[in-house]
Every structure is written in structure tokens, then in C-alpha cells.
């Protein structure tokens, strides 16, 4: 936005009665764009917007002839906004007012460049290729494209022949490279050059304006449909600061913004979108914050729906959050939100997975995740507090977080295919750096928790190193005698897991458990195995006992099942180590 466009916007707002205290001044800066600065100290400064310039669902309802029951009214609002921006040949008239002329100063003042990753060029997007944002781009496009197609194909007012290329792109989206999509759609959106107002590039531009600038209509109208949104000129110039204490409220149909407390001279007056991490800020608003205390990593866990159903029915203490549990508005319908969160949930609510957010500032953020991974690790007779299940859950969660950390690679090699915007590089670097820091901190906390649990419960844990130290007969005589008929061939033991199985087989056969480890024999005797022989048992028997008859397949299967259900494996240590747990 230029200084002239800002001046014209403020004059336009004043002509409709927008109230801005004289102590506040909007300025254009090269560093931050538009800012609002206090020229003097002012207590509780407020900005008030009259209903005449609120861009709401009333406009598309009247123009398109929609009803209160029309589905996706926000989608129609985005189409309407695209029309007043890009339909240069026809006036858009509502209540005998040329809406395109009425809002021209506002339209002219909107950003000439959008920084949402949804319109980054291929070279820029490569800097996000290994992150949640980069991995979700295709899915987001698919959702926006589908919304557009359902709207334009639902009414005869849209000539689909004129947007046939966009329709074809929608149907072939899975087959297109990102480079092709950028050339066909995104470049047109980014440069704001759609030639047809109901084309997908026009709709995408409007969509990006709304996700970066919209306010909940609930502030003005408590009886509005759920999630209904509005645009509020002038107020949407204020930048975000999570430390800013503000309130939004209606006053005789006007929207009112108020800064709580004193706004100091020469300081910027800011809005507050709520606590948002850099992933949400970059995806929705096109910027990031360094040292953002609300920064988080989203970890999506996809579970079979029958597992979800069982958890919902039998494990009420397990938290399976939906995205709506995290998403809040700075001014939300609390009654509606509470009812929504109390509503009975079903497995189909989690068809896209369960999403957890990890935040360094929240000491308890890993607990729900660890509970879930413990549940997924536990044997049928165990509960969430059993030591073995808990330790195995820690291993599973560590592996998942380490895998996610490993997937976030460094900046790609220099790519000259497209010009790269330095600001977008900055945003990508801050975002990815934050993701890595959070994952590393989470892994450190899990490692510390594991170390504490291993130390406090060492009397209940049996490692192969302890066995070799306290049961020398196993390695010196029993194990060699078991394989004495191998024709001189060297027997290689693959892991401590294999050695534990062999130890249990030998100790049980010879009834030679050392006194201090007799608990293993008792635990083994009490263990009930399943009726069928597993493929793992068959493979193990073939690997070690194919040439001898001393150990039958059923014995091997029993020992394997016992070790699986009574041990955990530290796969995150330098070497995998299987450890038996006393129950």
C-alpha cells in the first residue's frame, strides 16, 4: 500500500464516520508496512467502525439472492468480494449502491503482495518442503479448489465455459506438478491479474484476504451463523502483538476496538489475534514472529477408526483433541464453543487423525501424547500406569518426534528457476528454526523423563548386561551347548531381543534361573500365550533351530510372546536394547 492509498482510505473512512482518536496516526513504513502510532499518551484508545462499511454476508445475500439457510455463506461472501475487486466491466449494485465504487478506496489499499505460502513460487516453497506447511499445501489447495467449484457449479449465473481451464485444473489437480499449478493459477493470483471475477485465481485471492484479515461476525451479531466472518476496514490495518491487551465489542451496530490501559507516546498501537504459533501466522497471515512464546509443532497421529472407537468408549482419561479444541478467536462465542467441546464425539471426527500441539512454554503438553503412545504400546492386561507400557510409550513417542525432526532438512541448494523473495526466505527460516527447537526440546524432556524412570525403577528392570554379569553359566556353558551341533558354523546373535528369548528358553528348559531372577521364571509360567503360532516365531525357529530338534516351535512362540509383552526396546539409544520389566 502506498502513502497515497493509505491517505485515501483514511479520508474514505472519515466520510462514513469512522472514529479514530486524534492522538493516533497511521503511517506507511518500509519495514512493517502500515503501523498505527500514538503521538501522545492516551488512555484506553478506541477505534469505531460504522455498520455502513462492514463487509458482511448481507451483501452477497442481497446480490446473489441467497437465504439464511444457504450453505457456505462465507464462500459466497468471498465470491462477492472477488466480484467487486475484479469485475471491471460491470457495476455490482446492492440497495441501489454501486458497491464496487463504494469500497474502491478499501480495495485499492489492500496489500499489493500476499505472502501466504499458498502463492509462493516453486523455488520459495522448497524452503518449506519438509515442514507441516509444505506437506499440507496440496491438501489446502484441494479444499479451496473444491469450495470454489461447488459454488460456481451450483448456480446458472456462472458461465463455466469461461472458466473451463480452471475446472479442468480442479479435476486434474492430483496429476499436476506444483510448477504447472503455479503457472496456471498461482502466478495470476499473486500478481492480482484474474480476467474473470469468478475464476479460481480471483476466488483464491479473495480467500487469502479473508483468512488474513477477517473478524468473527459474532462480535457484531450474536445471532449470526457459526463461523460467519466480516471484513472491517481501518481496524484491519492494526498489526498483531500477542502482548497487547485489547477488547472488541458492539455498540449500536458499530464495531469497536479498544486498547486496554495506556497507549504510550511513540509506541505502536496493535491488535491481538490471540496466541498463535508461527505455523498459523505464516499460513494465515503471511508473517512470523521471532521468539514467539506461542510457537508450536503440530503432530498428527492417524489411528484406525476402530482403535479410536475403543478409546472413546473405554478410555475417558485419554485426550483425543480436535483442531477446534485449540482454535480460538479473540472474541468468541464461549457458550457455543463450550457446547461444541462437550458434544459427544465419534470415530469419524478423527478420520484425518488426532492433532496434538507441542509448545516449549507448556510443561504438560507432552502428557496427552505420552498417554496415547502408552495406550498404543500396552498389552491387553496392562493399563496406562504400568511401567513397561509407559517406558515403551516413551520410546514410541521419541521415535516419532525424532523422525519428524529428521524430516526437517536444511535450506535447499540455490535454485535460480524463480526469483526468491528475501522476506519469504526469512519467514521460512524463522519458522523451520522454531520447529526444530521445539522438537529438540521435547526430545530432551522425554530423554530426561526416561532417565528418571529407569533410575527409580532399576530394581524392576533386567538387561542383558545384568544377565551376563550375574548368570555367567548362560554365556559360558548353556548357550554354547545349545548350538554344539552346528557343524562348526559361527552363530551370530542379532540383538539383545534374540538373546533374551534364548535365555528364557534355556533357563526354563534347565530350570536354572539364578535366585535373583526367579521372578522371570514365575512371570513366564503365569504368562498366557495366544493359540496361534506367529510368523515371527517361525522365522526365529528357522534362524536358530532349523538343524536341531531340541527346541520346538511352540516353545519359541511362547518365549517370543512373553518377551514382547514383558519388555520394552530402547530403539532411541545408540544400540537397540531390549529390557525385561518385572510386573
UniProtKB/Swiss-Prot annotation:
Belongs to the class V-like SAM-binding methyltransferase superfamily. RKM1 family. Residues 22-274 form the SET domain. One of its GO terms (biological process) is methylation. Residues 378-407, 433-459 form a coiled coil. One of its GO terms (cellular component) is nucleus. It comes from the Eukaryota. Keywords: Coiled coil, Cytoplasm, Methyltransferase, Nucleus, S-adenosyl-L-methionine, Transferase. Present with 4800 molecules/cell in log phase SD medium. This is Ribosomal lysine N-methyltransferase 1. Its EC number is 2.1.1.-. Its main location: cytoplasm. S-adenosyl-L-methionine-dependent protein-lysine N-methyltransferase that monomethylates ribosomal protein S18 (RPS18A and RPS18B) at 'Lys-48' and dimethylates ribosomal protein L23 (RPL23A and RPL23B) at 'Lys-106' and 'Lys-110'. S-adenosyl-L-methionine binds at residue 273. It is found in: Cytoplasm; Nucleus. GO terms for molecular function: protein-lysine N-methyltransferase activity. PROSITE patterns: SET.
